[in-house]
């Protein structure tokens, strides 16, 4: 046995250790179901397996990281740790909506595994059709389980659960792109390219806000590494399995990564077809045909297997009207999206991209920038058929933009001797600028925090004010006072709760419920308001609530015309004296005053119809979310 082990490579020994660990986990899970140690140990094993998979992908892709690369990796991780520690510690951010979803999923996953091992795995698998799957929580439990389990802790722990594998694969991608671009000055190229990519603000943006969606980039980078220089000239079964696994992984992370997968596959197939046509014209017809046949066979088999593997998700996608339900988020289609992309990328990055395009044209190396450009355009066109992107959805375009950045980095590195000081200043200034960008829910243009706070145009003064309020809260004490009042006046055992009308980035029910994570003080005592057509149902809980909370001025932070909470609030204010009396008010210290209204008369059909009639347009589009919900509630209450 010792002789067999000694013959294994270092990576082989790692996989042998992982197999032994998996066997030990199985035995432990069967012997001690419900143990509080099982889920953290499972998460630790998954992270180790993912890191080993990353190393295996690098080897299959023909990329070897030497001591120089490893030293840069360790240094970058250390800088990232300091950055996260400083950035998270210098703000007071309240996690809500999408920013709290994964944290709550982590709590729920822990609770499920605390019941039993089987219950935990069922919880993970049952989410496959949801917008947020439980795939990421499987990896983020360790070391989150060792922390105070606050929102900031969850963001910081991604340094250990996400960043190591991500950095290793990004380093490999930088090297692979350098091979394709035939870079000679490899060390300068790696320093510039790797640092440029890793400091790109929208790489870390969602992670800083408690959304570990950048986890999907681990699998996206795997896919790029395995395919960028592979042309199906020979059959490579291990590579095919890794490509399939990477594709499944990126889709399981977040469903909208499918737009990247489709866009990249289209661009890759187009590249392969063009290269095969060129081969055929050069007299290598048989080689070109073999390429295309292998591509077609692999593509069909992989697509069929993927549909079977993700059949529940496929059924959900085919049976759900995403364009209709998410129309609220479609602000202006492809035209507005191109403008948004330009603002997010910024002038400094576009200068680099321009240098890269000039470099690729001069060296007659069009494949990489063309592949990236086609992937970006295809993904943009597909995504904007449903909606426009938020800052976290920018992640699905990151692989394409990074390939363009790397092409520009090659141009800088190869010509570093000319205008050396100017180029080094440009590089250093861009890194400092990128690291200073504020990662806020309202970030539209990638600007440092000091630039946002002192932006000279009066036209954006309201944006600056709201950005400050939402990113670094100054009203945490006031929010806690509201929480304490609701907690004291609502008895959950009697079914008493409050309903909050505001549903906005400035104020919403999530901020009050999750203001002191991991403690959820108002569990079952605060209901959320209606806001997004196609997403939120007619709020029948409003008619059951003991108290209703609203605010003056009513929060409406850059909402679209179809937003519903403002309309509901206007209806409430016009008729509240018939059913409510004022119970309390709270000055939030920033110009907003919350008022609590206590219901004095039980809801009747006339009151329900008063609100329902005001949403006739929404009812015509989504009757199952409005009139059917209202009628069902009325029937259930004998009205």
Task: List each model region and its residues.
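Short acidic/glycine- and proline-prone juxtamembrane loop motifs at membrane-interface regions
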Residues: 202-215
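Membrane-interface alpha helices of multi-pass inner-membrane proteins
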Residues: 239-255, 266, 380-381
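Start-transfer (signal-anchor) and selected internal transmembrane alpha helices
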Residues: 1-86, 290-300
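Transmembrane-lumen/periplasm boundary regions of multi-pass, lipid-linked membrane glycan transferases
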Residues: 102, 108-109, 260-261, 265-271, ...
């Amino acid at each position: 046995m010792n002789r067999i082990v000694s013959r294994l490579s270092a990576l082989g020994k790692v996989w042998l250790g992982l197999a032994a660990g998996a066997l030990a986990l199985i035995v432990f899970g069967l012997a001690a179901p419900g143990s509080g140690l099982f889920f953290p140990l499972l998460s630790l094993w998954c992270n180790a397996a993912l890191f080993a998979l990353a190393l295996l992908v690098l080897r299959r892709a023909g990329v070897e990281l030497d001591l120089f690369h490893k030293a840069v990796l360790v240094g970058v991780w250390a800088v990232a740790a300091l950055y996260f520690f400083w950035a998270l510690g210098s703000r007071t951010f309240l996690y809500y909506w999408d920013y709290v979803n994964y944290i709550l999923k982590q709590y729920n996953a822990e609770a499920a595994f605390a019941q039993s091992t089987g219950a935990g795995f069922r919880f993970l698998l049952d989410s496959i059709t949801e917008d947020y799957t439980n795939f990421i929580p499987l990896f983020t439990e360790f070391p989150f389980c060792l922390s105070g389990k606050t929102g900031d802790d969850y963001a910081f722990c991604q340094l250990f659960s996400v960043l190591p594998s991500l950095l290793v694969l990004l380093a490999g991608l930088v090297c692979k792109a350098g091979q394709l671009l035939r870079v000679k000055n490899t060390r300068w190229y790696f320093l510039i390219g790797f640092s440029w990519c890793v400091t790109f603000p929208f790489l870390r943006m969602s992670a800083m806000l408690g959304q570990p969606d950048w986890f999907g980039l681990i699998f996206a980078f795997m896919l790029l590494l395995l395919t960028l220089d592979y042309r199906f000239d020979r059959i490579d079964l291990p590579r095919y399995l890794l490509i399939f696994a990477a594709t499944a992984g990126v889709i399981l992370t977040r469903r909208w990564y499918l737009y990247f997968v489709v866009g990249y596959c289209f661009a890759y197939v187009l590249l392969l077809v063009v290269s095969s046509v060129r081969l055929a014209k050069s007299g290598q017809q048989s080689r070109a045909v073999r390429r295309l046949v292998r591509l077609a066979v692999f593509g069909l088999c992989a697509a069929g297997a993927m549909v079977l593997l993700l059949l529940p998700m496929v059924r959900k996608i085919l049976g759900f009207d995403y364009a209709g339900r998410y129309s609220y988020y479609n602000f202006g289609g492809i035209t507005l999206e191109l403008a948004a992309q330009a603002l997010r990328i910024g002038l400094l990055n576009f200068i680099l991209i321009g240098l890269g395009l000039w470099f690729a044209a001069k060296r007659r190396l069009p494949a990489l920038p063309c592949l990236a450009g086609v992937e970006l355009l295809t993904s943009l066109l597909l995504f904007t058929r449903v909606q426009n992107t938020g800052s976290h959805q920018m992640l699905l375009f990151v692989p394409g933009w990074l390939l363009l950045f790397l092409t520009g980095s090659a141009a800088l590195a190869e010509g570093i001797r000319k205008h050396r000081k100017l180029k080094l200043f440009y590089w250093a200034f861009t890194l400092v600028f990128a690291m200073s960008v504020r990662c806020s829910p309202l970030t539209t243009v990638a600007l440092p925090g000091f630039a946002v706070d002192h932006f000279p145009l009066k036209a954006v003064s309201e944006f600056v004010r709201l950005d400050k309020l939402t990113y670094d809260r100054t009203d945490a004490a006031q929010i806690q006072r509201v929480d304490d009042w609701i907690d004291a006046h609502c008895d959950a055992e009697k079914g008493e709760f409050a309903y909050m009308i505001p549903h906005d980035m400035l104020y919403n029910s999530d901020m009050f419920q999750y203001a002191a994570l991991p403690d959820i003080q108002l569990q079952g005592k605060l209901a959320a308001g209606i806001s997004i057509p196609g997403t939120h149902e007619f709020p029948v809980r409003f008619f059951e609530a003991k108290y209703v909370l609203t605010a003056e001025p009513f929060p409406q932070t850059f909402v679209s015309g179809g937003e519903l909470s403002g309309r509901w609030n206007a209806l409430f204010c016009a008729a509240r004296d018939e059913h409510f009396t004022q119970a309390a008010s709270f000055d939030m210290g920033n110009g907003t005053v919350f008022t609590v209204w206590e219901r004095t008369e039980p809801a009747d059909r006339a009151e329900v119809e008063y609100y329902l009639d005001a949403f006739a347009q929404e009812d015509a589009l989504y009757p199952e979310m409005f009139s059917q919900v209202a009628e069902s509630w009325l029937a259930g209450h004998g009205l």
